[in-house]
């Protein structure tokens, strides 16, 4: 059972982040921002003027009390010890910001917005050094690659995933998730599958910097490998029965958390699955499509009409959590030395699940 952190918000929580020193921050609808201690006690709270939703929060790794928060078109820089007073703020995006990402050297901050643009802010000189405009719809998620401070990946509701280098204003590589799935989508469909286009909601890069994952509205989880100036899809599997709202690699591992609109949270071992695929002599594009079965999944209350093995394309999850609420944000972090999953959903509380076995 999850431990519930309450008392910090009165509206749905939209985003979470943790500092290296155990502080946590959460942003919610209506401009609410709360800081938490490791025991789930609210330590501070502020409400931004304008009451725009707080869509992304991000601690500075080198200065654990410094916090970045996006609300509306604004990025605020705060001291978590005194949230009422902003240290600085930037208004560089023209539409609502959906996601923030810091590069590893902490001199650049990326902000992705509803216009599809990604603004790259030089934090030392306090000015925009790049405006990356290639997404034709909302840019939902952006992430700098660890160990590569000039490289980032992004995804959006235009169903596109992009690899960028800040040396260039154009993406190095683009894939359209819907087009790439055309061949695989042939054959029998599960109910409602055709109604869900591959709108990309969330992106996460593993600590190595070369493996990243994307979650989309079609319920699929895709894992890519960066190969120089292009990427290759290593895996693509049906991870959820409805849209995948969140993907999140655990720190220093290839364990991948995914959360969906189906109210489920799942843990996958991306590394072992990629290794298995590489050892298989069958090319991805020519693999047999699994036959649909009528078995229900073991150990879960589900109406899925396919077996676990078939639904995930022979990829079995390490852990399944029936959370029961649409997942807004997932965070894997250590609390008091133990790995935990923190979940923000449509409620005003934060759910904490221990990951003792890992």
Swiss-Prot record:
- Region (Disordered), start-end ranges: 273-311
Start and end residues of the WD repeats are 1-38, 43-80, 85-123, 127-166, 173-225, 232-270, 314-355
This protein's record includes keyword Repeat: yes
Q: What Pfam families does this protein's entry cite?
A: Beta-prop_DCAF4 (PF23761), WD40 (PF00400)
Q: Which UniProt keywords apply?
A: Repeat, WD repeat
Q: Does the keyword Transport apply?
A: no
State where composition is biased (Basic residues).
Answer: 279-294
In terms of PANTHER family, this protein maps to: WD REPEAT-CONTAINING PROTEIN 53
For this chain, the family text in UniProt reads: Belongs to the WD repeat WDR53 family.
Q: List the protein's name.
A: WD repeat-containing protein 53
Q: What is the scientific name of the source organism? A: Homo sapiens
**Record gene name:** WDR53
């Amino acid at each position: 059972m999850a431990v519930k952190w309450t008392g910090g918000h009165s509206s749905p929580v939209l985003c979470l982040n943790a500092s290296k020193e155990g502080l946590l921050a959460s942003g919610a609808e209506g401009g609410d921002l709360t800081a938490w201690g490791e025991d789930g006690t609210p330590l501070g709270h502020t409400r931004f003027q304008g009451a725009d939703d707080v869509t992304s929060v991000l601690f500075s790794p080198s200065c654990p009390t410094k916090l970045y928060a996006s609300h509306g078109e604004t990025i605020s820089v705060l001291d978590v010890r005194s949230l009422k007073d902003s240290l600085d703020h930037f208004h560089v995006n023209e539409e609502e910001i959906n996601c923030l990402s810091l590069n590893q050297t902490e001199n650049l901050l990326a902000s992705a917005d509803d216009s599809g643009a990604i603004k790259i802010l030089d934090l030392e000189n306090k000015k925009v050094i790049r405006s990356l405009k290639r997404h034709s719809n909302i840019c939902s998620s952006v992430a700098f690659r660890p160990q590569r401070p000039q490289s980032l990946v992004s995804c959006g509701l235009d169903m596109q995933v992009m690899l960028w280098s800040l040396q260039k204003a154009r993406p190095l590589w683009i894939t359209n998730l819907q087009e790439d799935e055309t061949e695989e989508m042939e054959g029998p469909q599960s109910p409602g599958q055709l109604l869900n286009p591959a709108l990309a909601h969330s992106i996460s890069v593993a600590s190595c910097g070369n493996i990243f994952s994307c979650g989309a509205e079609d319920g699929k989880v895709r894992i890519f490998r960066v190969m120089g100036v292009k990427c290759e899809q290593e895996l693509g599997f049906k991870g959820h029965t409805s849209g995948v709202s969140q993907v999140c690699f655990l720190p220093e591992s290839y364990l991948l958390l995914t959360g969906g609109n189906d109210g489920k949270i799942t843990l996958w071992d991306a590394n072992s699955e990629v290794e298995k695929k590489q050892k298989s002599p069958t090319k991805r594009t020519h693999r047999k499509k699994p036959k649909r079965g009528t078995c229900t999944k073991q150990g879960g209350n589900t109406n899925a009409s396919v077996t676990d093995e078939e639904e995930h394309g022979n990829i079995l999850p390490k852990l399944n959590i029936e959370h029961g609420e649409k997942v807004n944000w997932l965070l894997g972090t250590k609390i008091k030395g133990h790995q935990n999953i923190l979940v923000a959903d449509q409620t005003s509380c934060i759910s904490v699940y221990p990951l003792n076995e890992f």
